[in-house]
Amino acid sequence: MSSDNMIDLEGYDCMAWYDEAVFYHIYPLGLTGAPKTNDYGEPVHRLNTLLPWVKHIKETGFNALYIGPLFESVGHGYETTDYKKLDSRLGTNEDLKAFVKECHEQGIRVIFDGVFNHTGRDFFAFKDLQKNREQSPYKDWYCNVNFGGNNEYNDGFSYENWGGYNLLVKLNQHNPAVRDYICDVIRFWVSEFDVDGIRLDAADVLDFEYMKALRRTANEVKPEFWLMGEVIHGDYSRWVNEGTLYSVTNYQLHKALYSGHNDHNYFEIAHTVKRLYEMGGNRPEGLKLYNFVDNHDVERIYTKLQNKAHFTPVHVLLYTLPGVPSVYYGSEFGIEGKKERYSDDSIRPALNLADYANAAEENPCTKLIAALGRIRQHTKELSYGDYKELMLQNRQYAFSRSLDGKSVIVMVNND
């Protein structure tokens, strides 16, 4: 990579923090080694064990953190019991406030996981529905409640769920009371925890008018409050626009980055980038997608790569292609994690930071990630620059990121 002299940033004062964000991603129930099932007992202050990670996050070149799910649930975190209470396996609301405060003091923005498509069965509205049935004031809070049906829990009624799992009860997003409640949750998270944004879980099945209501609330609660959505397939511009979300997860590039290296096929990567760039109107500010090579739902990149040396070009591309880069906790150390059929434990492990005390000096993966983070944060072309493909072959790929007449040239190979 090469760059001309530093550019004049006078014209970029209006840019938001997320335009230059480099994200670190934590799944806290996994990283802290929390029990798989919540007994709703006394809080255990596991979140406090993540405070030393804040310094590590900063020193490894990150200036933003996506952490979640965080709030009270019975199991993996996505079956919410209470949106306004930190999961008791992680601690108390005071612990979460202190954690966000420490991140902010280190110059790290924080976004939470917002699980607003569905609730768990222990959520107050569903408990009332179980108790009062047709007389419940919350009977219209959920989709397709049928009091003539039943389910494996023998509720005496059936309902729409997410993903075929009745543990995850789909909210009726057309109901104004539901919208008002969730918007109030967003306001609470800002006033209580000073959060900087939200990643919307299952955004690809959220109602668009519902998301627009969330966006209006986001615009009101805090300057530069960022809404990013989990979307797998489709035309991302349906979600990323002025009235809906600021960004979505870039699963299309995620797939191309690892398979393009395993198959020695940079055409797959370059054509994916071109297609995504065109979705945004051929301008970098059009779609600033949330780029990643692994996360809490997919296999670790170091496991997916057939040639482990490709860890380097994969991450060079992650940090230099249009979009917002993100690294999943532990992957900066090059750890492995295979996706298993009935368990995500191997991709959501507990880690002890002390075991990686010398990684910054001795671990080549960590050194690479830290160097790329520094480059990204000090090279504005990578955040704001136009993209232009310069050379493309099966095993070689070059492109430029240009801004105000100055360019960064990126060249990678997969030999």
Feature locations, PLM:
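The substrate-binding groove and active-site-proximal loops of carbohydrate-active enzymes
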Residues: L29-L47, E79-N93, G164-R179, D196-V205, ...
